[in-house]
């Protein structure tokens, strides 16, 4: 299955997220400028985990994300429960978390354009990160991202590269996702922007493939290419 543009029928759009005529999934902007205090989320509508069997699908994501203005606050690839709604609009919470607590949270990989030790130290079971490599992005350039999860190894790996540039950024960690998430989850993106900083968060293309441990990998789903 392929789409040349993002297919709204296969996506759950929340908050300020829109599908534009250029095939980009973006936060809403006013008069061409990034909107302040903005939150947008978009998720694929089909769940990827069948808890009764104890099996989790593997996935791959390829994202291209430009940064056209000053840094803040970032966007994240996330797995959220089916029926999840946008959370606290505080920009540092990425639209995925209600507050800094130790309750069960989504599993997310954040592309943080505003490095802040208060929000970015290593710590499990919270908004705080379990792996935090620095990301010195060239402003306005497109980044390509690959995210993989191996259910057998319980290993989550994310890599980011600008074409023709180095280095790769390779955070990884062992995550027992079946212990962190409920029975049904959906994959997608969430992005926020604060009151003062200015940037937009665009997903230019997104491909998705998954398989159960005992099955052959699916051909793949290009939600936009």
Curated annotation (Swiss-Prot):
InterPro entries (UniProt xref): ConA-like_dom_sf, L-lectin, Lectin_legB_Mn/Ca_BS, Legume_lectin_dom, Leguminous_Lectin
Family of the protein in this entry: Belongs to the leguminous lectin family.
Assembly and oligomerization: Homotetramer.
Gene3D superfamilies reported for this sequence: 2.60.120.200
Molecular function GO terms recorded: carbohydrate binding
Protein name: Lectin
Record organism: Vachellia farnesiana
Tagged with keyword Ligase: no
Keyword terms: Lectin
Protein's job: Chitin-binding lectin. Agglutinates rabbit erythrocytes, but not human erythrocytes.
């Amino acid at each position: 299955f392929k789409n040349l543009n993002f297919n709204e029928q296969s996506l759950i759009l929340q908050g300020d997220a829109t599908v534009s005529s250029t095939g980009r999934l973006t936060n809403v902007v006013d008069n061409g400028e990034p909107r302040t205090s903005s939150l947008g989320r978009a998720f694929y509508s089909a769940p990827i985990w069948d808890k009764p069997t104890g099996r989790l699908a593997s996935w791959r994501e390829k994202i291209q994300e430009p940064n056209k203005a000053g840094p803040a606050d970032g966007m994240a690839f996330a797995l959220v429960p089916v029926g999840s709604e946008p959370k606290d609009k505080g920009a540092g919470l990425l639209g995925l978390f209600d507050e800094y607590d130790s309750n069960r949270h989504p599993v997310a990989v954040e592309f943080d354009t505003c490095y802040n030790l208060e929000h970015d130290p290593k710590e499990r079971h919270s908004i705080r990160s379990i792996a935090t490599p620095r990301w010195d992005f060239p402003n306005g350039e497109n980044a390509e991202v690959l995210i993989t999860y191996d259910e057998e190894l319980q290993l989550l790996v994310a890599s980011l590269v600008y074409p023709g540039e180095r280095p790769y950024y390779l955070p990884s960690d062992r995550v027992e996702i079946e212990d962190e998430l409920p029975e049904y989850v959906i994959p997608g993106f969430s992005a926020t922007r604060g009151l003062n900083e200015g940037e937009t968060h665009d997903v230019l293309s997104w491909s998705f493939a998954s398989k159960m441990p005992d099955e052959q990998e699916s051909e793949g789903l290009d939600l936009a290419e």
